[in-house]
Amino acid sequence: MTNVYFLDIFMFVYVLQFLFYFKESMLGVLVNKFLGLLVVVFSYTDSLPLSSVISVFTFLVLLTCCFGGYFMYSFCPCGMIEFTFVYAMVAWLSTLLTFITSEKFSIYISKAGDSFLKTFSMLLVELVSEVSRPLALTVRLTVNVLVGHVISMMLYQLLELYLGIFYVWIVVLAIVMECFVFFIQSYIFSRLIYLYLNE
Protein backbone atom coordinates (compact mmCIF):
# COMPACT_ATOMS: atom_id res chain seq x y z
CA MET A 1 0.00 0.00 0.00
CA THR A 2 3.04 2.26 0.28
CA ASN A 3 3.77 2.14 -3.45
CA VAL A 4 2.83 5.20 -5.47
CA TYR A 5 2.09 4.53 -9.12
CA PHE A 6 2.12 6.87 -12.08
CA LEU A 7 -1.63 6.45 -12.57
CA ASP A 8 -2.27 7.61 -8.99
CA ILE A 9 -0.30 10.82 -9.54
CA PHE A 10 -1.90 11.33 -12.94
CA MET A 11 -5.42 10.99 -11.51
CA PHE A 12 -4.54 13.33 -8.64
CA VAL A 13 -3.26 16.02 -11.03
CA TYR A 14 -6.21 15.42 -13.37
CA VAL A 15 -8.70 16.05 -10.54
CA LEU A 16 -6.71 19.04 -9.26
CA GLN A 17 -6.95 20.84 -12.58
CA PHE A 18 -10.74 20.84 -12.31
CA LEU A 19 -10.54 22.19 -8.79
CA PHE A 20 -7.93 24.91 -9.23
CA TYR A 21 -6.43 25.49 -12.65
CA PHE A 22 -9.21 26.30 -15.08
CA LYS A 23 -10.62 29.81 -15.36
CA GLU A 24 -13.98 28.59 -14.11
CA SER A 25 -12.72 25.98 -11.65
CA MET A 26 -15.07 24.26 -9.25
CA LEU A 27 -13.41 25.76 -6.22
CA GLY A 28 -13.34 29.22 -7.80
CA VAL A 29 -17.03 29.04 -8.66
CA LEU A 30 -17.83 27.89 -5.12
CA VAL A 31 -15.83 30.73 -3.55
CA ASN A 32 -17.36 33.33 -5.90
CA LYS A 33 -20.89 32.09 -5.13
CA PHE A 34 -20.20 32.17 -1.39
CA LEU A 35 -18.72 35.68 -1.47
CA GLY A 36 -21.57 36.87 -3.68
CA LEU A 37 -24.04 35.46 -1.18
CA LEU A 38 -22.27 37.28 1.65
CA VAL A 39 -22.43 40.59 -0.22
CA VAL A 40 -26.16 40.05 -0.77
CA VAL A 41 -26.65 39.15 2.90
CA PHE A 42 -24.82 42.28 4.01
CA SER A 43 -26.91 44.40 1.60
CA TYR A 44 -24.50 46.43 -0.46
CA THR A 45 -25.30 50.16 -0.61
CA ASP A 46 -24.05 52.87 -2.97
CA SER A 47 -23.53 55.41 -0.17
CA LEU A 48 -20.76 53.35 1.45
CA PRO A 49 -19.52 50.87 -1.15
CA LEU A 50 -16.80 49.37 1.05
CA SER A 51 -19.05 48.76 4.05
CA SER A 52 -20.16 45.36 2.79
CA VAL A 53 -16.55 44.42 1.99
CA ILE A 54 -15.48 45.34 5.53
CA SER A 55 -18.40 43.41 7.00
CA VAL A 56 -17.74 40.34 4.87
CA PHE A 57 -14.05 40.48 5.81
CA THR A 58 -14.97 40.77 9.50
CA PHE A 59 -17.37 37.85 9.17
CA LEU A 60 -14.78 35.65 7.48
CA VAL A 61 -12.02 36.54 9.97
CA LEU A 62 -14.25 35.83 12.96
CA LEU A 63 -15.50 32.61 11.42
CA THR A 64 -11.93 31.49 10.70
CA CYS A 65 -10.87 32.32 14.26
CA CYS A 66 -13.86 30.47 15.71
CA PHE A 67 -13.44 27.34 13.61
CA GLY A 68 -9.65 27.35 13.85
CA GLY A 69 -9.67 27.73 17.60
CA TYR A 70 -12.44 25.22 18.14
CA PHE A 71 -11.11 22.45 15.93
CA MET A 72 -7.44 22.94 16.87
CA TYR A 73 -7.67 23.67 20.59
CA SER A 74 -11.36 22.89 21.37
CA PHE A 75 -11.86 26.48 22.54
CA CYS A 76 -12.91 29.44 20.47
CA PRO A 77 -10.77 32.61 20.76
CA CYS A 78 -13.96 34.67 20.48
CA GLY A 79 -14.81 33.32 23.93
CA MET A 80 -11.79 35.15 25.37
CA ILE A 81 -12.53 38.71 26.35
CA GLU A 82 -9.03 39.93 25.42
CA PHE A 83 -9.36 38.85 21.80
CA THR A 84 -12.88 40.19 21.37
CA PHE A 85 -12.04 43.50 23.04
CA VAL A 86 -9.04 44.12 20.78
CA TYR A 87 -11.01 43.10 17.69
CA ALA A 88 -14.00 45.23 18.73
CA MET A 89 -11.73 48.23 19.35
CA VAL A 90 -10.12 47.91 15.93
CA ALA A 91 -13.50 47.52 14.22
CA TRP A 92 -15.03 50.39 16.18
CA LEU A 93 -12.08 52.69 15.50
CA SER A 94 -12.35 51.97 11.79
CA THR A 95 -16.04 52.90 11.85
CA LEU A 96 -15.37 55.97 13.98
CA LEU A 97 -12.59 57.23 11.72
CA THR A 98 -14.76 56.62 8.66
CA PHE A 99 -17.54 58.58 10.33
CA ILE A 100 -15.28 61.47 11.38
CA THR A 101 -13.97 61.91 7.85
CA SER A 102 -17.48 62.11 6.41
CA GLU A 103 -19.51 65.29 6.06
CA LYS A 104 -22.17 63.99 8.43
CA PHE A 105 -19.89 64.43 11.43
CA SER A 106 -20.34 68.20 11.72
CA ILE A 107 -24.12 67.80 11.43
CA TYR A 108 -23.95 65.04 14.03
CA ILE A 109 -22.05 67.24 16.48
CA SER A 110 -24.18 70.39 16.24
CA LYS A 111 -27.56 70.74 14.65
CA ALA A 112 -28.63 74.15 13.36
CA GLY A 113 -30.99 76.10 15.60
CA ASP A 114 -30.20 74.31 18.86
CA SER A 115 -29.15 76.17 21.98
CA PHE A 116 -25.68 75.76 23.46
CA LEU A 117 -26.91 73.81 26.49
CA LYS A 118 -28.92 71.38 24.38
CA THR A 119 -26.03 70.92 21.95
CA PHE A 120 -23.59 70.32 24.82
CA SER A 121 -25.85 67.82 26.59
CA MET A 122 -26.60 65.96 23.35
CA LEU A 123 -22.88 65.89 22.56
CA LEU A 124 -22.21 64.21 25.92
CA VAL A 125 -24.97 61.67 25.30
CA GLU A 126 -23.67 60.89 21.81
CA LEU A 127 -20.10 60.67 23.09
CA VAL A 128 -21.10 58.13 25.76
CA SER A 129 -23.06 56.23 23.12
CA GLU A 130 -20.07 56.10 20.78
CA VAL A 131 -17.56 55.13 23.46
CA SER A 132 -19.78 52.34 24.83
CA ARG A 133 -19.99 50.57 21.46
CA PRO A 134 -16.73 48.57 21.66
CA LEU A 135 -17.62 47.45 25.17
CA ALA A 136 -21.07 46.36 24.00
CA LEU A 137 -19.58 44.50 21.02
CA THR A 138 -17.06 42.78 23.29
CA VAL A 139 -19.57 41.69 25.89
CA ARG A 140 -22.12 40.59 23.30
CA LEU A 141 -19.70 38.41 21.33
CA THR A 142 -17.87 36.92 24.32
CA VAL A 143 -20.94 36.12 26.39
CA ASN A 144 -22.95 34.72 23.48
CA VAL A 145 -20.13 32.43 22.33
CA LEU A 146 -19.52 31.21 25.89
CA VAL A 147 -23.23 30.66 26.56
CA GLY A 148 -23.59 28.80 23.25
CA HIS A 149 -20.61 26.63 24.18
CA VAL A 150 -22.00 25.89 27.66
CA ILE A 151 -25.51 25.10 26.38
CA SER A 152 -24.28 22.79 23.63
CA MET A 153 -21.95 20.99 26.05
CA MET A 154 -24.76 20.64 28.61
CA LEU A 155 -27.02 19.13 25.97
CA TYR A 156 -24.21 16.83 24.87
CA GLN A 157 -23.56 15.68 28.45
CA LEU A 158 -27.27 15.16 29.07
CA LEU A 159 -27.77 13.11 25.92
CA GLU A 160 -24.62 11.13 26.64
CA LEU A 161 -25.84 10.42 30.17
CA TYR A 162 -29.18 9.05 29.02
CA LEU A 163 -28.25 7.42 25.72
CA GLY A 164 -24.71 6.27 26.45
CA ILE A 165 -21.44 6.90 24.69
CA PHE A 166 -22.15 4.54 21.81
CA TYR A 167 -23.97 7.10 19.69
CA VAL A 168 -21.53 8.95 17.46
CA TRP A 169 -24.24 11.27 16.18
CA ILE A 170 -24.43 12.92 19.62
CA VAL A 171 -20.87 14.20 19.20
CA VAL A 172 -21.67 15.33 15.66
CA LEU A 173 -24.78 17.13 16.96
CA ALA A 174 -22.71 18.96 19.60
CA ILE A 175 -20.16 20.05 16.99
CA VAL A 176 -22.92 21.21 14.61
CA MET A 177 -24.52 23.26 17.41
CA GLU A 178 -21.17 24.90 18.19
CA CYS A 179 -20.66 25.70 14.50
CA PHE A 180 -24.15 27.20 14.33
CA VAL A 181 -23.30 29.45 17.30
CA PHE A 182 -20.11 30.53 15.52
CA PHE A 183 -22.00 31.41 12.34
CA ILE A 184 -24.69 33.37 14.17
CA GLN A 185 -22.30 35.33 16.40
CA SER A 186 -19.90 36.14 13.56
CA TYR A 187 -22.83 37.37 11.49
CA ILE A 188 -24.23 39.50 14.33
CA PHE A 189 -20.84 41.08 15.08
CA SER A 190 -20.12 41.89 11.44
CA ARG A 191 -23.69 43.13 10.90
CA LEU A 192 -23.31 45.55 13.82
CA ILE A 193 -20.06 46.83 12.31
CA TYR A 194 -21.93 47.30 9.03
CA LEU A 195 -24.69 49.23 10.80
CA TYR A 196 -22.13 51.41 12.57
CA LEU A 197 -20.51 52.17 9.22
CA ASN A 198 -23.84 53.13 7.64
CA GLU A 199 -24.86 55.62 10.33
UniProtKB/Swiss-Prot annotation:
It is a multi-pass membrane protein. One of its GO terms (molecular function) is proton-transporting ATP synthase activity, rotational mechanism. The keyword Transmembrane applies. One of its GO terms (cellular component) is proton-transporting ATP synthase complex. It is found in: Mitochondrion inner membrane. Pfam families: ATP-synt_A (PF00119). The chain crosses the membrane at residues 2-22, 25-45, 53-73, 80-100, 143-163, 164-184. Keywords: ATP synthesis, CF(0), Hydrogen ion transport, Ion transport, Membrane, Mitochondrion, Mitochondrion inner membrane, Transmembrane, Transmembrane helix, Transport. It comes from the Eukaryota. SUPFAM superfamilies: F1F0 ATP synthase subunit A. Its main location: mitochondrion. PANTHER family: ATP SYNTHASE SUBUNIT A. F-type ATPases have 2 components, CF(1) - the catalytic core - and CF(0) - the membrane proton channel. CF(1) has five subunits: alpha(3), beta(3), gamma(1), delta(1), epsilon(1). CF(0) has three main subunits: a, b and c. Belongs to the ATPase A chain family. Mitochondrial membrane ATP synthase (F(1)F(0) ATP synthase or Complex V) produces ATP from ADP in the presence of a proton gradient across the membrane which is generated by electron transport complexes of the respiratory chain. F-type ATPases consist of two structural domains, F(1) - containing the extramembraneous catalytic core and F(0) - containing the membrane proton channel, linked together by a central stalk and a peripheral stalk. During catalysis, ATP synthesis in the catalytic domain of F(1) is coupled via a rotary mechanism of the central stalk subunits to proton translocation. This is ATP synthase subunit a. It comes from Ascaris suum (Pig roundworm). The lineage of its organism: Eukaryota, Metazoa, Ecdysozoa, Nematoda, Chromadorea. The gene is ATP6.
